[in-house]
């Protein structure tokens, strides 16, 4: 039998079981755990497109039509990184969804084929490339529509939050207030190759106006201190959420005017809630909002400007806060408000709480103390910093492999951090039946990366099975690669293909009320569901519940008695090596 060297094989078909890959210029190393393309019984039946390759008529391409089972698109030899594993596989796409993860080819000439390639099948060659699920940013201030293209080009395919544009309320708070604005934003969502959903304003002490917003299609409600996050408003908002199976996101009371963190926790009454920027620099009970990380009903997230803690973090935050919350540096009380939120001790602890899996979600806080295009970059920078400062991260003790074998890779840490911007926000907001992972039946939102550019600059962004964005060269060139290469919208982002390739998430009440027809919407509407039963224990790889202690005088943070502190990073990967600015 003919053989091929491991290096030559990886160069031709991509890495296989036991091969290791470095992610960008970080210190993170992944190792391939399984190879689904070997279901034919071993090596030698791989598929590959190109001159002299195997995906040709009568070889790995069958005669079968779409009706006879051939897929619309096959992504060949992809290195999948997802919360459930790091595997090599072919991926079959059909009707905008993922229909198979396994071995592609021609079942008439090859064994073990579970993805049929036919004359009607397109090929995206992923040999040597990484494929991840599209990212999910759950903390969006919809200040300008250009945010969406910026996020898409970074690998984000789902965005939820609130706003109406550059209105003063939207600059500060993440809500689309009232049924009229919700209708307008849902109509605007039809223009974008992005899964979108909007949260209504949750600050009210009586339920009628909140139900009105949910019935109008808001997928949840947002409580923000700038609108008055009192215990009465919290309780009322959660009452409505419980009745409508929607999520509540909260920005708590920095000034402790209407109560302390203990009062807010009491108002939760054990009900599930998504706490935004749980460290507190983005807002929340000063100085101890981070205590909520240890509560079983709290689904905690971070926003990216504090990720990770660096020598520049503190200096940039005060100015950001003054602008975002309509404060005046000439007013002493406004300045004191800003400075009370920026604490190096809690920001440093936030790094470690992410590494421990105690903070479950990463998000941006776009243009409102956060950078919409940097959710993914800053997640991996945090992972890199934590490996550099805390060493290798051991997987759960149920893993039976020898420690020496496990220490060859960072697979567990990589799965933990990936889950923070994929499956966990999807679970939190009731969308995991559609998005958040590479699994059968889910919407085909996939991001292709060259390993050297992983987390920094994707090669392709696939939305609902169509390529919606890509790093593309000069359109007048004779080939696709000449400079200037930059992100450009592709055919999946135009015309009717745009509407077929993306989802708009709404409440079940709104869907039942027929808002799609009433508002004249063209995108497919999907109702959020199974939200109210979600707890911290359901956060994949990120469900640690420490007993939190925060000293009100020194701001020192302890988790289960351990002092959490680390040095700021002086330099980071995924920065100047990739960007001019």
Swiss-Prot record:
Subcellular location: Cytoplasm
Enzyme active site: 325 (proton donor)
Cofactor: Ni cation
List of residues binding Ni(2+) 2: 222, 251, 277
Post-translational modification N6-carboxylysine, affected residues: 222
EC number(s) per entry: 3.5.1.5
Chief site of localization: cytoplasm
Pfam family, one: Amidohydro_1
Cofactor, free-text remark: Binds 2 nickel ions per subunit.
Catalytic activities: urea + 2 H2O + H(+) = hydrogencarbonate + 2 NH4(+)
Residues binding Ni(2+) 1: 139, 141, 222, 365
Subunit structure: Heterotrimer of UreA (gamma), UreB (beta) and UreC (alpha) subunits. Three heterotrimers associate to form the active enzyme.
Family membership noted in the UniProt record: Belongs to the metallo-dependent hydrolases superfamily. Urease alpha subunit family.
Protein name listed in UniProt: Urease subunit alpha
Organism per entry: Albidiferax ferrireducens (strain ATCC BAA-621 / DSM 15236 / T118)
Name of the gene encoding the protein in the UniProt record: ureC
């Amino acid at each position: 039998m003919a053989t091929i060297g491991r290096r030559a094989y990886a160069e031709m078909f991509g890495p296989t079981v036991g091969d290791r890959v470095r992610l960008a210029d970080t210190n993170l190393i992944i190792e391939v755990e399984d190879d689904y393309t070997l279901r034919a019984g071993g090596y030698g039946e791989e598929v590959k497109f190109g001159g002299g390759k195997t995906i040709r008529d009568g070889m790995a391409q069958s005669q079968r039509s779409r009706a006879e089972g051939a897929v619309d698109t096959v992504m060949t030899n992809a290195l999948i990184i997802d919360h459930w594993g790091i595997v090599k596989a072919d991926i079959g796409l059909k009707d905008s969804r993922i229909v198979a993860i396994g071995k592609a080819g021609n079942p008439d000439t090859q064994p073990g084929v579970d993805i049929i390639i036919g004359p009607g099948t397109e090929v995206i060659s992923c040999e040597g490339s990484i494929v991840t699920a599209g990212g999910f940013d759950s903390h969006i201030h919809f200040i300008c529509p250009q945010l969406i293209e910026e996020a898409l080009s970074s690998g984000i395919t789902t965005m939820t939050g609130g706003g109406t544009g550059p209105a003063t309320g939207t600059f500060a708070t993440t809500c689309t207030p009232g049924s009229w604005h919700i209708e307008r934003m849902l109509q605007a969502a039809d223009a974008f190759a992005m899964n979108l959903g909007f949260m209504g304003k949750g600050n009210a002490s009586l339920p009628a106006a909140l139900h009105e917003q949910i019935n109008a299609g808001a997928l949840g409600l947002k409580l923000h201190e700038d609108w008055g996050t009192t215990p009465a408003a919290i309780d009322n908002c959660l009452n409505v959420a419980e009745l409508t199976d929607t999520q509540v996101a909260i920005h708590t009371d920095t000034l402790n005017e209407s109560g302390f963190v203990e009062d807010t926790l009491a108002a939760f009454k054990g009900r599930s809630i998504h706490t935004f920027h749980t460290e507190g620099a983005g807002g929340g009970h000063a100085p101890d909002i981070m205590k909520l990380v240890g509560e079983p009903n709290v689904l905690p997230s971070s926003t990216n400007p504090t990720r990770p803690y660096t020598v520049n973090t503190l200096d940039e935050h005060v100015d950001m806060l003054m602008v975002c919350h309509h404060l005046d540096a000439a007013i002493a009380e406004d300045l004191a408000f800003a400075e009370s939120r920026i604490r190096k001790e809690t920001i440093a602890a936030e790094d470690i709480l992410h590494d421990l899996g105690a903070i479950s979600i990463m998000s941006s806080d776009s243009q409102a103390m956060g950078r919409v295009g940097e959710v993914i970059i800053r997640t991996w920078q945090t992972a890199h910093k934590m490996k550099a400062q805390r060493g290798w991260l051991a997987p759960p003790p149920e893993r039976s492999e020898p420690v020496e074998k496990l220490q060859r890779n960072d697979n567990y840490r990589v799965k933990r951090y990936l889950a923070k911007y994929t499956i966990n926000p999807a679970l939190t907001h009731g969308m995991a039946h559609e998005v958040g992972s590479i699994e059968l039946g889910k919407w085909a939102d996939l991001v292709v990366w060259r390993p050297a550019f992983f987390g920094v600059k994707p090669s392709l962004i696939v939305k609902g099975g169509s390529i919606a964005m890509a790093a593309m060269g000069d359109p007048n060139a004779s080939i696709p690669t000449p400079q200037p290469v930059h992100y450009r919208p592709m055919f999946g982002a135009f015309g009717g293909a745009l509407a077929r390739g993306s989802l708009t998430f709404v409440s079940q009440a709104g869907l039942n009320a027929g808002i799609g027809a009433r508002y004249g919407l063209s995108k497919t509407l999907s109702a959020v569901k199974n939200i109210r039963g979600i707890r911290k224990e359901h956060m994949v790889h990120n469900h640690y519940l420490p007993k939190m202690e925060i000293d009100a005088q020194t701001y020192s943070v302890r988790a289960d008695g351990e002092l959490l502190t680390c040095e700021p990073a002086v330099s980071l990967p995924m920065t100047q090596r990739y960007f001019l600015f």
